[in-house]
Regions:
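C-terminal helical cap/extension that packs against the catalytic core
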Residues: 8-11, 50-108
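Short, active-site-adjacent cap segments at secondary-structure transitions
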Residues: 117-119
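Active-site-proximal loop/hinge segments that shape catalytic or ion-binding/gating pockets
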Residues: 114
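Nucleotide phosphate-binding/pyrophosphate-handling subdomain across enzymes
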Residues: 1-59
């Protein structure tokens, strides 16, 4: 109910550098703008992970991973993204992020960065 008919939603549990590269390679094959929603664990290589998507996302929205004490704080993740030349913002949660970027325009929205985040998305939506 938060997406328009011209929008595609992709969810990917990628959380390692190798899986981020694979996701990024796939995203490069898509047409149209791509928006990301990302939450990641503190123990990951945040800078390298985000840098992989540097030229892929039109905008990146960062979120905390719900009920996960090891979640990297969303504002810290947004700062890392901005340092890597991404237009980035933080959102309260997945729903807030979807509301922020959803519109009538054709686009792909990708939720990624943690299996815990994806599990929460699937459980609640």
């Amino acid at each position: 109910k938060y997406l328009h008919k011209n929008e595609k939603l992709l969810i990917d549990g990628c959380h390692s550098l190798a899986s981020a590269k694979n996701l990024n390679d796939y995203l490069k094959s898509l047409n149209g703008p791509i928006y990301g929603i990302c939450g990641i664990q503190k123990n990951k290589k945040h800078e390298k992970f985000i840098k992989i998507f540097k030229k892929t996302f039109k905008q990146l929205i960062t979120v905390n991973i719900p009920n996960e004490s090891n979640s990297l704080e969303k504002n810290k993740l947004a700062l890392i993204a901005k340092k890597n030349s991404l237009e980035a913002y933080s959102a309260k949660n997945i729903v807030s992020a979807l509301i922020r970027i959803s519109s009538e325009d054709n686009k792909t929205i990708v939720i990624f960065g943690s299996l815990y985040l994806i599990g929460d998305v699937l459980k609640n939506n």
